[in-house]
């Protein structure tokens, strides 16, 4: 991992931190701010690779905000190129081998998943902006998704087990418990583990996984931001919120 000068870290994090603090809205000049940040970082003589990543992150966060976390469906396509640009700069190609980075509590700032955003639901039952969290345990074996609805009065959760694949970036997910407020709903135990391919000897997922299972690939990871792709083609951009809640 590159170690940029202290002044550069402070300059960049002031932009990113202000975005965190404001929760869901950036000023219309966010993209111009990113360009100004580029000048500041160049002046601080930061390593070029780190500089490029930080600028791409600030621009992506601005575009996520403009798309309303993905709720503005017609703006989603504009976010994809910014995601792909950052994925190409991924400093951690095998995130499963860096549990100290991948674990923790992450806050969702953009997704293309209508169900995660609650768009099919009545408006009061949609998650509050900035209140969709995902916690990954220290050993990367458990994940907890949390959302708050009804103006934050009710919390829904979904807990799942993670099984890593051999590529170092993909996990198979098996949900084992859901809760709606105080009501816990266990999921019947299902054999979701990987099977051994007779031809290659590699572990592969079952041909017909159950509906409460999925696949998630981490395509970008650093200390503050994560990008993941799901098996149904959905994109997820998350920022670090704090320590894991599982």
Spans of model-derived segments:
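Acidic, low-complexity intrinsically disordered regions
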Residues: 13-15, 32, 46, 102, ...
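N-terminal chloroplast transit peptides
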Residues: 1-32, 41
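Intrinsically disordered, low-complexity linker/propeptide segments enriched in Ser/Thr/Gly/Pro
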Residues: 34-48
């Amino acid at each position: 991992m590159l170690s940029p000068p202290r002044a550069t870290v402070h300059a960049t994090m002031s932009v990113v931190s202000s975005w965190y603090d404001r929760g869901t809205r950036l000023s219309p000049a966010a993209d111009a701010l990113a360009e100004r940040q580029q000048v500041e970082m160049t002046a601080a003589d930061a390593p070029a690779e780190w500089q490029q990543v930080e600028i791409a992150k600030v621009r992506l966060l601005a575009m996520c905000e403009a798309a309303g976390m993905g709720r503005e469906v017609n703006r989603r396509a504009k976010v994809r190129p910014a995601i792909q640009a950052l994925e190409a700069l991924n400093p951690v190609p095998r995130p499963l081998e860096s549990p100290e980075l991948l674990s923790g509590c992450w806050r969702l700032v953009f997704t293309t998943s209508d169900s995660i955003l609650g768009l099919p639901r009545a408006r009061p039952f949609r998650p509050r902006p900035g209140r969709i969290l995902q916690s990954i345990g220290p050993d990367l074996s458990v994940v907890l998704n949390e959302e708050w609805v009804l103006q934050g009065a009710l919390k829904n959760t979904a807990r799942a087990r993670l099984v890593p694949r051999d590529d170092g970036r993909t996990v198979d997910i098996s949900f084992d418990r859901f809760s709606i407020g105080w009501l816990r709903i266990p999921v019947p135990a299902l054999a979701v583990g990987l099977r051994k391919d007779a031809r290659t000897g590699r572990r592969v997922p079952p041909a017909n996984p159950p509906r409460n299972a999925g696949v998630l690939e981490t395509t970008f990871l650093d200390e503050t931001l994560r990008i993941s792709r799901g098996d149904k083609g959905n994109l997820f951009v998350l920022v670090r919120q704090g320590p894991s809640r599982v």
